[in-house]
UniProtKB/Swiss-Prot annotation:
Native species: Arabidopsis thaliana (Mouse-ear cress)
Annotated transmembrane regions: 12-32, 42-62, 90-110, 135-155, 162-182, 210-230
Membrane topology reported for the UniProt record: Multi-pass membrane protein
UniProt entry tagged with the keyword NADP: no
SUPFAM superfamilies cross-referenced by the UniProt entry: Aquaporin-like
Chief location category: endoplasmic reticulum
GO molecular function per UniProt: water channel activity
Motif (NPA 2): 188-190
Compartments (UniProt record): Endoplasmic reticulum membrane
Primary gene name: SIP1-2
Protein name: Probable aquaporin SIP1-2
Length: 243
């Protein structure tokens, strides 16, 4: 029953995250315009990081309210592989499809809600710049990189929640910017599926190969390396006193 509750929470938070994250570009452009930062090369990157920081902060609260809900199946798999998750293989198998359904619902909803003039400025249509094989390699590397950074920040990073959240936002934006030269990097199979569903490419081999197999591979390999570098402390069993 707890696995089903987790899956439902994941579906809800992924639905909401897709709607919000689809507008990051619009939010960044609006803020740049409002503060008069046109022509300043670093402004969009800094503002994007702040937008993501605020968004992650809000969704951390929402996730806690929903009982630890998550919008990234690769994250769930990585924490399980690293040995720091209460998930089982069964719960992971339930949560991942729920996140994909939530992402598809969010993508459909935002495309219906957004005014026509903004539709070309939102969304996340998967884009392979150099073919499926190169896209798969880049997605493995990007997923590996961002997963290791996330594990490092959350498990070995600063204790202050705001500091953790800011570093997560910085890592996410940095990896996304680097990866945009090769694919539209998702590092999140559920969200990739949601937008692929909009563009009718969700049931293709290239989509499954690049955005599911490769993303999971990168995340799991990263978690395995993290577990080797930072092994969990051994459990110390207390000796029972003799009566």
């Amino acid at each position: 029953m707890s696995a089903v509750k987790s899956a439902l929470g994941d579906m809800v938070i992924t639905f909401l995250w897709v709607i919000l994250s689809a507008t990051f570009g619009i939010q960044t452009a609006a803020i740049v315009s409002a503060v008069g930062f046109h022509g300043i090369t670093w402004a969009p990157l800094v503002i994007s990081t702040l937008v993501v920081f605020v968004s992650i902060s809000i969704f951390t609260v929402i996730g806690n309210v929903l009982g630890g809900a998550s919008f990234n199946p690769c994250g769930n798999a990585a924490f399980y592989t690293a040995g720091v998750s209460s998930d089982s293989l069964f719960s992971l198998a339930i949560r991942s499809p729920a996140q994909a359904i939530g992402a598809a619902g969010g993508a459909i909803t935002i495309m219906e809600m957004i005014p026509e003039k903004y539709k070309t400025r939102i969304g996340g249509k998967p884009s392979l710049q150099f073919g499926a094989h190169n896209g798969a390699i880049s997605e493995v590397v990007l997923s590996f990189s961002v997963t290791f950074l996330v594990l490092l920040i959350i498990l070995r990073g600063p204790r202050k929640l705001l500091a953790k959240t800011f570093l997560l936002a910085l890592a996410t934006v940095s990896v996304f910017v680097v990866g945009s030269k090769f694919t539209r990097p998702f590092m999140n199979p559920a969200i990739a599926f949601g937008w692929a569903y909009i563009y009718k490419s969700h049931n293709t081999w290239d989509h499954f190969y690049v955005y599911w197999i490769s993303s999971y591979t990168g995340a799991i390999l990263s978690a395995m390396l993290f577990r080797i570098i930072f092994p969990a402390p051994p459990l110390v069993q207390k000796k029972q006193k003799k009566a």
